């Protein structure tokens, strides 16, 4: 029986997130009014989340190639070669809007989705990281959101069985109505067994794998492409529900059918579910796709074609199967207790045809849905340059030691232990360096190789100067990987911005991308995967521009990794890199002086590369006993973190007369490291560094149980540690 078609009104088009000109483009493309299912398909494929229509033009400027890159952007995840027929597969992706509406499930399914992106490529996940941005601590929703998101990330990762080894947590009032949950997953695969999404061959069976389809997550991708308002909490039904135990079964079943050589192409059902997975597989392979929705396993009776095509139920995959392997593949999935259903086949027509109940519900051109979606060159204006702050013009309201006591326990700089202790960071037994250091270190199989992993960005720099902020995010990832002894190899990015229809916001995105591209070229770390999340604003107020950078580096021998903890008393403390006392956009200027202003510190990429190469050499030769990169909070914060980690104090010289004390100790100049070396090796190290033109200054030595600066009162390391560890648990317990 034929159902009565739904009239397509301007209101219905608008509710699907399509602009009037985009709807006119659809009419011209298909030569008729679309059905409701077709409108839903266009809405899913042409939204910002799936099509990158506002950013695609500018993403083309990113460097994506290197001899060690096996797969760059455009697939489920990026792939790099690390030798010995081993490949690392990794990507970072956002789940921002769902996590604000339903923090536990939003964060959990964000982790689940990124894990699927990695194992779809044939890799076994070995580590997760995340970058979490929350509103101001005093905002009434913040505590609830932190609690839910952290529980969701931990609950999914811990149950699935992958360690969560590092990340970032920040608080800022600009995220009050729009938190960010960026999840990164890293997997290990055989370099000659990488599985891609492009279908090949006509008449090949298309198989639905995994969990059943329900009504959860319908319009999830469209919601991720919209701005928020006061009624956004009503969108809770569009948040997907995750089952990490089903995902673990799906992982094992997928890796088993891959090993059995059953797979032509495979794609995870993520944003826009069955629609995007089927369209992407066909479009990438220059093939059409016919789907029969009567064959789709459903969780609820009476689901319409529209609902099935747009559902974002979790733990599902779509595969193009080698026909002769059907019985073997089905047996594997039945063994793991998962659905296996042939729901369609590839065609030579370049049409996307969807049938349900004996009727054709959609018949559309597949290329125009996929890689030929709309592309916008949106108007953008460059962010105005801010004046350079001169440190001598900033009068310190309190002394250096008082400032240290205040900053080390502040929301910006305090320990994140409360967060990472809720994650299982050692499951699998390969975590060499746990959270709390510059980068996580994960052993590969039984060694000797290891991976250095980090996630970095400084949003306040990106707003003040998007170009320098973009450069700094990459440079910070480079330094963090270097500080543990890793050689940075490649990057995944997660670009979180406000409304791209506002020229100043589009200008932030363009500026950050220019800086990121320049840094990636200079530091030889190409972008191999990524994600763009736009429209992160509530009631017209955008987030801070937050291009999260996920970095992956390689250690030839994980036993030679460095940590930030002081190791012994009597060692020389060296400051590597040039210090000018840059206070613009520093934590000190904001939190101690109450001023959010000035140009951020400039990033000299030549100095970053030169200094990083020297520090890695010191680690590999065994000269460096402790290493820490300098970032938020500057020199004195980094020294305090090293002292706290090692339970050893330091006797520090006063800073040079040319730089005022508060700028020397709290300036945030880039390309700097702190390194300790044994006293008997000091002269040799200083001579070598001078010969290669690397600025280096001995600023003190490790000693005792206090941090003491010449001319200032000493402060006990235990007191610093208490202040550093106290704020977050007190806040989450309602005491701060």
Swiss-Prot record:
Reaction catalyzed: N(2)-formyl-N(1)-(5-phospho-beta-D-ribosyl)glycinamide + L-glutamine + ATP + H2O = 2-formamido-N(1)-(5-O-phospho-beta-D-ribosyl)acetamidine + L-glutamate + ADP + phosphate + H(+)
A molecular-function term among this protein's GO annotations: phosphoribosylformylglycinamidine synthase activity
Binding annotation for Mg(2+) 2: 117, 268
Keywords: ATP-binding, Cytoplasm, Ligase, Magnesium, Metal-binding, Nucleotide-binding, Purine biosynthesis
Keyword field contains Ligase: yes
Binding site for ATP: 52, 91, 493, 530
Chief place of localization: cytoplasm
Binding of Mg(2+) 1, residues: 93, 531
Function: Part of the phosphoribosylformylglycinamidine synthase complex involved in the purines biosynthetic pathway. Catalyzes the ATP-dependent conversion of formylglycinamide ribonucleotide (FGAR) and glutamine to yield formylglycinamidine ribonucleotide (FGAM) and glutamate. The FGAM synthase complex is composed of three subunits. PurQ produces an ammonia molecule by converting glutamine to glutamate. PurL transfers the ammonia molecule to FGAR to form FGAM in an ATP-dependent manner.
Protein name: Phosphoribosylformylglycinamidine synthase subunit PurL
Originating organism: Rhodopseudomonas palustris (strain BisB18)
Lineage, highest ranks first: Bacteria, Pseudomonadati, Pseudomonadota, Alphaproteobacteria, Hyphomicrobiales
């Amino acid at each position: 029986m034929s159902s009565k078609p739904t009239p397509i009104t301007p209101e219905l088009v608008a509710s699907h997130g399509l602009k009037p000109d985009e709807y006119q483009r659809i009419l011209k493309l298909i030569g008729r009014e679309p059905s409701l299912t077709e409108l839903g398909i266009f809405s899913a494929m042409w939204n910002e989340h799936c099509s990158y229509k506002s950013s695609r033009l500018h993403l083309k400027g990113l460097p994506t190639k290197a001899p060690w890159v096996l797969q760059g952007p455009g697939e489920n995840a990026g792939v790099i070669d690390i030798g010995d027929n081993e490949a690392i597969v990794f990507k970072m992706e956002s789940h921002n809007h769902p996590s604000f509406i339903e923090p536990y499930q939003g964060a959990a399914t964000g982790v689940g989705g990124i894990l699927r992106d990695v194992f779809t490529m044939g890799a076994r996940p070995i580590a997760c990281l995340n970058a979490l941005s929350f509103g101001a601590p005093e905002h009434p929703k913040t505590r609830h959101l932190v609690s839910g998101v952290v529980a969701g990330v931990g609950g999914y990762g811990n149950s699935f069985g992958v360690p969560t080894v590092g990340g970032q947590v920040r608080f800022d009032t600009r995220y009050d109505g729009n938190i960010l949950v960026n999840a990164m997953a890293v997997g290990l695969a055989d370099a000659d067994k990488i599985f891609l999404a492009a279908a090949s061959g006509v008449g090949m069976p298309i198989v639905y794998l995994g969990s059943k389809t329900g009504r959860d997550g319908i319009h999830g991708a469209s919601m991720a492409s919209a701005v928020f308002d006061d009624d956004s909490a009503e969108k809770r039904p569009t948040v997907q529900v995750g089952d990490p135990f089903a995902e673990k079964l799906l992982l094992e079943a997928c890796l088993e059918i891959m090993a059995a050589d059953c797979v032509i192409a495979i794609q995870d059902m993520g944003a826009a579910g069955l629609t995007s997975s089927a369209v992407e597989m066909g479009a990438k392979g220059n093939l059409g796709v016919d789907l029969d929705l009567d064959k789709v396993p459903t969780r609820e009776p009476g689901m319409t074609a529209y609902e099935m095509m747009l559902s974002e139920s979790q733990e599902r995959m779509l595969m193009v199967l080698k026909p002769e392997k059907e019985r073997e593949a089905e047996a594997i999935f039945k063994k793991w207790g998962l659905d296996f259903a042939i729901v369609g086949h590839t065609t030579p027509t370049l049409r996307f045809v969807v049938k349900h109940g004996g009727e054709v519900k959609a018949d559309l051109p597949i290329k125009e849905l996929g890689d030929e979606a709309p592309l916008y060159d949106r108007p953008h204006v460059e962010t105005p340059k801010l004046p350079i702050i001169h440190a001598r013009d900033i009068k310190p309201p309190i002394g250096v030691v008082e400032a240290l006591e205040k900053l080390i326990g502040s929301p910006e700089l305090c320990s994140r232990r409360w967060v990472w202790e809720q994650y299982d960071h050692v499951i699998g037994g390969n975590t060499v360096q746990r959270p709390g250091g510059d980068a996580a270190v994960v052993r590969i199989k039984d060694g000797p190789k290891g991976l250095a992993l980090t996630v970095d960005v400084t949003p306040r720099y990106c707003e003040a100067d998007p170009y320098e902020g973009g450069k700094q995010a990459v440079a910070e990832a480079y330094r963090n990987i270097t500080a543990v002894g890793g050689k940075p190899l490649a990057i995944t990015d997660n670009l979180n911005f406000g409304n791209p229809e506002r020229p100043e916001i589009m200008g932030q995105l363009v500026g950050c991308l220019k800086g990121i591209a320049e840094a990636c070229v200079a530091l030889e770390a190409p972008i191999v995967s990524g994600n763009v999340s736009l429209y992160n604003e509530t009631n017209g107020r955008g987030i801070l521009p937050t291009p999260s950078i996920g970095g992956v580096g390689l250690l030839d021998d994980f036993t030679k990794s460095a940590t930030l903890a002081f190791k012994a008393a009597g060692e020389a403390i060296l400051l590597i890199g040039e210090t000018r006392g840059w206070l613009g956009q520093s934590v000190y200027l904001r939190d101690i002086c109450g001023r959010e202003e000035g140009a951020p510190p400039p990033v000299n990429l030549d100095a970053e590369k030169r200094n990083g190469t020297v520090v890695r050499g010191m680690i590999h030769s065994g000269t460096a006993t402790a290493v820490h990169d300098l970032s938020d909070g500057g020199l004195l914060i980094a020294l305090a973190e090293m002292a706290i980690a090692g339970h050893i104090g330091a006797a520090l010289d006063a800073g040079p007369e040319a730089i005022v004390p508060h700028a020397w100790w709290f300036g945030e100049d880039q390309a700097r490291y702190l390194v300790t070396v044994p006293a008997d090796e000091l002269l040799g190290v200083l001579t070598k560094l001078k010969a290669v033109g690397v600025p280096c200054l001995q600023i003190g030595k490790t000693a005792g149980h206090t941090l003491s600066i010449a001319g200032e009162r000493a402060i006990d390391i235990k007191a610093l540690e208490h202040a550093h560890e106290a704020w977050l648990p007190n806040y989450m317990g309602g005491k701060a």
